[in-house]
Each structure stands twice: as structure tokens, then as C-alpha cells.
């Protein structure tokens, strides 16, 4: 099988060259998360108990609330809609997942990781979401008029971008983050 090729590779290589002039820890660190498996599962409200049981078989404690992201040992789950979740990580078998209408989104998304001391400032410029809200950690929003999902972590953000807009959004993020170097 061919090695995964990213359309963002040259952008991030250029960014890395620019950051070599910085000494110490840069204010904004941008990287691409690669080889991440994303499987979307859909279920009806009446199937919530079945979904919860399925997730527990994967080692996940519960079905997260809307706009929540929970991590297990080898897999994570994000509640993207009331009746849709994303499993992020390698599924050992999709046999049990078939009843939840699995859809492989792995090659449909670029994932950009944004961290550093000024990452909060960059995100504030990118989208109109108050990321200080501690009750949610997974947001559906838009950047540059493109629908994206953002996973807010303790010290970083992961931005899930439709692949067809990956390069445009990455350029936009690089432009904004360059103000903080």
C-alpha cells in the first residue's frame, strides 16, 4: 500500500524552517496529526443504550454528552451530533459496529494540532467560540467559512478540517500564527 501523502506537508516544512530561527519554545506550535483512524457511527435515540454497551466493549466508560470528547485506552470518542459519534483510533473489528452505520472518515479529514503559549490567542482569532467553557471540549464551528470540529485539550487544540479545504485553512492558520512569533 502506498504511503499516506499529505497535501499539507510542504506548508509545514516551510513553517518548520521559519521556526528554526526561534530560540527556545515557540509561542505557537503547528503540526499535522497523521495516520489517525476516524470512524463515524450513527444511531437513533432509541438505540442509546446499545451504543453505550458497544462503547463499553471498547473500553470507553460511557457515551459522552453532546460536544464532549472522551479518551479510552486505545480509542477515543467524540459526540459530534446528538445521534452521531466519531471513534478516533484503530477499531480492532468493525463487526459489532455494523449496526451503527459505520462510515470511515479517515481520509476525509486533515487534523491540525495547535499548541504553545499563544495557541489560545490564535484560536480566538480563528473562530468565534469561547474555549474557556469547561463544560464542553469538542466544538463544531467554522474557520474561514468552512465547517470544522475542534477538540480542546489541556494544552493544545486539534482542528478537524475537511480534506478538500485543508491547505486553505492551514495557510490561514499559519498566517494568523505568524503574528505571534
Model-derived regions: residue spans:
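Basic, glycine/lysine-rich polyanion-binding surfaces/domains
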Residues: 1-181
